[in-house]
Design a protein with these regions (language model features):
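Divalent metal-coordination and catalytic microenvironments
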Residues: 38, 48, 81, 88, ...
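Pre-active-site segment of Zn-dependent metallo-hydrolases
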Residues: 11-20, 31, 37-82, 89-94, ...
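Active-site metal-binding loops of divalent metal-dependent hydrolases
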Residues: 48-52, 81-82, 138-142, 171-173, ...
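Glycine/Thr-rich phosphate-binding loops of Rossmann-like dinucleotide-binding domains
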Residues: 55, 87, 111, 145, ...
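Active-site-proximal beta-strand elements of phosphoester/diester hydrolases
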Residues: 27-30, 45-48, 134-140, 166-172
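Metallo-beta-lactamase
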Residues: 3-23, 103-165, 245-271
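Cap/insert and terminal regions of metallo-dependent hydrolase folds
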Residues: 76, 100, 106-110, 176-264
Length: 271
């Protein structure tokens, strides 16, 4: 991890060209790491936004896909858990504009003072309706403490549904049998799945490797797999370029390569 401190950041933000979304379409823009802008049914949703250059002592090695001031007006913000690479208070304070934010149970006190209109804390399988959206919190296999003594904080993924379209942001998770139940409960079309940090310095099994992400995708019965949570911060010992290569190889072995969409930061894709 130490050599990363001296590694020059790659990439460079550019003004994104957000397309006009037609009725029934979903536009997904990967900002980097687990951060996404999701546009559907005339609303803009920001998930796990982080524009910061450092996670305490961990350096950001890939620039965000675009600058924060290029964001459209954000209607709703979702945060999957309290870890610093997902809940970045500095970024949240900049995007807060009196809109609702949705977090797992026990995370609300970390965001209540940042400028959001209302904080919705969800329990597992609970749903909140925000405008045209139905947003549900799903379980995952991870952990939620921001510091050593706050083990009460929940963590999870979000299913976002509107107008017959459904997208799933997994948050952080190791592989676990619960993916099948998530697939049984929701008709997921697009699955945003983490594929990095599987060679964790702690040795804890709290992140999927790329092969397990393919297995989770199959059990979710989704139509498109978009990988995330790799290439931005060095959170594991694996090479930064390795996760998407292994993912495509595993998908090819299962005849699923055409269902994998490896995105470029800052480049919107309409589905």
């Amino acid at each position: 991890m130490i050599p990363s401190l001296f590694t020059k950041r790659s990439g460079g933000p550019a003004a994104p060209q957000f397309p006009k979304i037609r009725e029934g379409q979903i536009c997904v823009t990967w900002i980097g790491h687990a951060s996404f802008l999701i546009q559907m049914h005339e609303v803009n949703i920001l998930v796990d936004p982080i524009w910061s250059k450092w996670l305490k002592v961990i350096k950001r090695l890939k620039q965000p896909g675009f600058e924060i001031h290029h964001l459209p007006s954000i209607d709703f913000v979702l945060v999957t858990h309290a870890h610093f690479d997902h809940l970045d208070r500095r970024t949240l304070r900049r995007v807060a504009s009196d809109q609702p934010i949705v977090v797992p149970m026990g995370v609300g006190n970390l965001v209540h003072d940042l400028g959001f209109h209302i904080v919705h804390e969800l329990d597992y399988w609970q749903t909140v309706e925000l405008g045209p959206l139905k947003i549900s919190l799903t379980p995952c296999h991870h952990w939620g403490a921001r510091f050593l003594a706050d083990l009460h904080r929940d963590f999870g993924g979000f299913v976002i549904a509107a107008n017959g379209r459904t997208i799933f942001h997994c948050g952080d998770s190791a592989y676990f049998p619960g993916f099948k139940e998530i697939g049984d409960r929701y008709n997921i079309e697009v699955a945003l799945l983490p594929i990095g940090a599987y060679e964790a310095p702690t040795g804890r099994e709290v992140h999927m490797n790329p092969e397990e992400a393919v297995k989770a995708f199959v059990e979710l019965r989704a139509e498109t797999l978009i990988p995330m949570h790799y290439g931005t911060f060095r959170l594991g010992f694996e090479p930064l370029h390795e996760p998407p290569q292994r993912l495509l190889a595993a998908a090819r072995e299962h005849g699923l390569e055409q269902k994998v969409l490896v995105m470029t930061e800052g480049k919107p894709v309409v589905l």
